Amino acid sequence: MMPPRLPGGHGGAMRSRSSSSGHHLNTTFHKRRRRRQQHHIGGSHISISHGSYLALLLLSTTCSLVATSASSSSSAANTDIAPPDPPPVSQVSIASSSPCAPQHWWDSQRDRCTPCTRCQGEMIPLRPCQLHTDTICGSIYDLKIDWVVLAKTEPNWKERRKSSEYEHFEHNAPLQHLTHEQLQQLHEEAAAAWVLDWQTGVLYVAVLTCLVFFSVAACILIHHMRQWRRMERRLDQDVEELSTKLMAKLAEVQSLDGGTFFIGNADALRGLPASAATTHPATTQSGIFQPQHVLLPEKRGKHQERRILKTLQPGNVYIEESNAGLGGMGVGLGVRGCSGLKG
């Protein structure tokens, strides 16, 4: 606790600071005195708190030691008074006797090793022979088998069977007995499921076969379509070639009989002289024909040409003649073996 201030101490300090230095010294003395008193009070409180803490710690340790000593003495007295439990006879006998040979188990009633029982006939061992128990025989109907789970084709049927077997061995659950009718019903359900699986497999195979057939047919159809297109292109080319040859033959025949016929590039030959027309007959034959209707000369000229062609021998012969019908222009005629006239 801080000591009470003197009345008018704070105001006197303010006045002393403003009026004289004597009052200032007095106030500083009082301040130092107050600080010393505060430090003295705080140190006494700290020393008192540390002392009380140490006293409480010593008291608690002594109480705990007394309690532990009392509990140990009482437990020792109880153990001295109570007699020890006698060990069981079976454990003493087993510990004193030698271990049994293989395929033998210890019979506690007879106090000796006994050969394990062998299952006869259709009986199967439900539980094998162990050190303290004999073999347990039974039929297949005595087994704990979940036929419904076995009939289903699930991915985790093995795990379920293992878990059920472990639960049976751990908890010693009673064996489930299935009647002949129930077993027959389960077999019928399994057969129906097998038939359904077989039908499903056949359906899958049929669908796969159809898909393969249609895919092969589509490939063959596409191949034949390509072949037909190639044949059509070749046929068009052959038809064009035959048409050009036919037009050339028709021109040869009509030039002999009279009338109109077709020649190639007739406009170009109109302005050429007779010598140029005779020197370029092959080019006019092999070039692309541009159909032009040209009137042949009169019948007198045609008869004269026929007479000349009859007297000619086989070969290419070029004849130049000018008459009024042709208008003074030379025409080159090529004859190949008297078979036709090409211009």
UniProtKB/Swiss-Prot annotation:
UniProt repeat feature TNFR-Cys, residue ranges: 99-137
Keywords: Apoptosis, Cell membrane, Coiled coil, Cytoplasmic vesicle, Disulfide bond, Membrane, Neurogenesis, Receptor, Signal, Transmembrane, Transmembrane helix
Residue ranges, compositional bias (Low complexity): 13-24
Its membrane topology: Single-pass type I membrane protein
Record GO biological process: apoptotic process; negative regulation of neuromuscular synaptic transmission; neuron cellular homeostasis; photoreceptor cell axon guidance; positive regulation of programmed cell death; tumor necrosis factor-mediated signaling pathway
Disruption phenotype: RNAi-mediated knockdown in gut progenitor cells, enterocytes or cells of the enteroblast-enterocyte lineage does not affect stress-induced intestinal stem cell proliferation.
GO cellular component: cell surface; plasma membrane
InterPro entries associated with the record: TNFR/NGFR_Cys_rich_reg
Any matching Pfam family: TNFR_c6
Disulfide bonds: C100-C113, C116-C129, C119-C137
Ranges in the topological domain labelled Cytoplasmic: 223-343
Induction: Down-regulated by bacterial infection in the gut.
Chain spans, region Disordered: 1-44, 74-96
Composition bias, Basic residues: 29-39
Coiled coil: 225-257
UniProt cross-references to Gene3D superfamilies, sorted A to Z: Tumor Necrosis Factor Receptor, subunit A, domain 2 (2.10.50.10)
Single GO MF descriptor: tumor necrosis factor receptor activity
Keyword Transmembrane tagged: yes
Transmembrane segments: 202-222
Positions on the Extracellular side per record topology: 77-201
Signal sequence segment: 1-76
Keyword Repeat annotated: no
Function: Receptor for egr. Involved in induction of apoptosis by triggering JNK signaling. Mediates the tumor suppressor activity of egr which eliminates oncogenic cells from epithelia, thereby maintaining epithelial integrity. Following UV-induced epidermal damage, binds to egr released from apoptotic epidermal cells and plays a role in development of thermal allodynia, a responsiveness to subthreshold thermal stimuli which are not normally perceived as noxious. Together with Moe, involved in control of axon targeting of R8 and R2-R5 photoreceptors, independent of egr.
Record text on subunit structure and interactions: Monomer. Interacts (via extracellular cystein-rich domain) with egr (via secreted TNF-homology soluble form); forms heterohexamers when 3 copies associate with egr trimers. Interacts with Traf6. Interacts with Moe.
Note: 'wengen' is named after a village at the foot of the Eiger mountain after which the TNF gene egr is named.
Protein name per its UniProtKB record: Tumor necrosis factor receptor superfamily member wgn
Organism of derivation: Drosophila melanogaster
